[in-house]
Amino acid sequence: MTCNLLVILGPTASGKTRLGVAAARALDGEIISADSRQVFRGMDIGTGKDLSEYGDVPYHLIDICEAGSEFSVFDFQERFCTAYADIRKRGRLPVLVGGTGLYLDCVLRNYRLVKVPENPVLRAELDPLSMDQLAERLRALKPEQHNTTDLGHRERLLRAIEIAEGEKACGETGPVLPGLRPLVFGVRWERAVLRRRITARLKERLDAGLIDEVQALLDAGVAHRMLEHYGLEYRLVSQHLRGELNRNDMFQKLNSAIHQFAKRQDTWFRRMERQGVQIHWLDGAGDPLQGLLRVFMS
C-alpha cells in the first residue's frame, strides 16, 4: 500500500512542526496544518506558527481567517479536503502536521460531519441550564469530549451542544476521503523533558512579545470574550491585561495549563491508537527524521 498522506502529530512543544517541514522537504511534500488556532491571522507567537522554519516548503490552513471569527471542525475538514486534492493533483505529498486531536481524528477516522446552523429553539431550551448541567448534557452527547475549553465557556458549551445535537439528527453522510492511505508518525519525549521544553518555550514566547501580540488583537477589535474562547495563552494573557492576574501569576497558571493540555493531547493520541489508528512513535531526543524516512521507504 502506497502512502498518499503523511501525518505527523505530537503534544505541544514536541518539535512536530520542525519534523514536518524536514519531512516535506525530503519527500517533495507540502504542509497542511492541523492546529485549531493557526488558522487565525495575527495569532502567531501564541500558536507557535514558526513560519520562518518553513522556508520554501508550501503550507496550507495557516492564516486563512480573521482573528475573532469562528472556525469549526466541519470548516477544517472541508478546507483539508480542498488542500489535499490540490496537493495531490500537482503530484506532491500532503503532510498533515498538528496536535489538535479532533482535527486529526476527523481526517484519519473519516468523520461524517455536517454544517450545523444555529438553533434558536434549542438555545431557548438550554438557556435556563447551569454550566454544570450544560457540561453534563454535552458529555452525554459526546462522552469522548477532548476540548475542555468548551466546558468552561458558556457560549462554546452552547455551540458544542448545538453541533452535537445537529450531527445526531442528521446521521451519517457518505465518506469524505474514501481513498486515503495515511502513514502516521508521532513525536514522543520523556515526560520530564517535555515539561522542561514547554516551560522554556513559554518563556521564549513571552520574551518574543506574546503580551504585545494579545494587546494588538484587542486593539484590532477582537473582544476579550473571543480571546477566552481561543484558550490557553490568549485567555490568560487577556486576563493579565484586564488586571485580573499579575505577570507572575499569569506565567504560573499558563505554564500549568499548557502542561495539562499536553497530557490531554497524549490521552487523545492513545485513544486514537485504541480505535485503530496505527502511530509510529519517534524519539524526539534522537533523529526523528531518519526514523520517519526508514519507515516511509520500507
Swiss-Prot record:
It catalyses: adenosine(37) in tRNA + dimethylallyl diphosphate = N(6)-dimethylallyladenosine(37) in tRNA + diphosphate. Residues 35-38 are annotated as: Interaction with substrate tRNA. It is an enzyme of class 2 (transferase). SUPFAM superfamilies: P-loop containing nucleoside triphosphate hydrolases. Its EC number is 2.5.1.75. ATP binds at residues 10-17. Its cofactor is Mg(2+). PANTHER family: TRNA DIMETHYLALLYLTRANSFERASE (PTHR11088:SF60). Belongs to the IPP transferase family. This is tRNA dimethylallyltransferase 2.
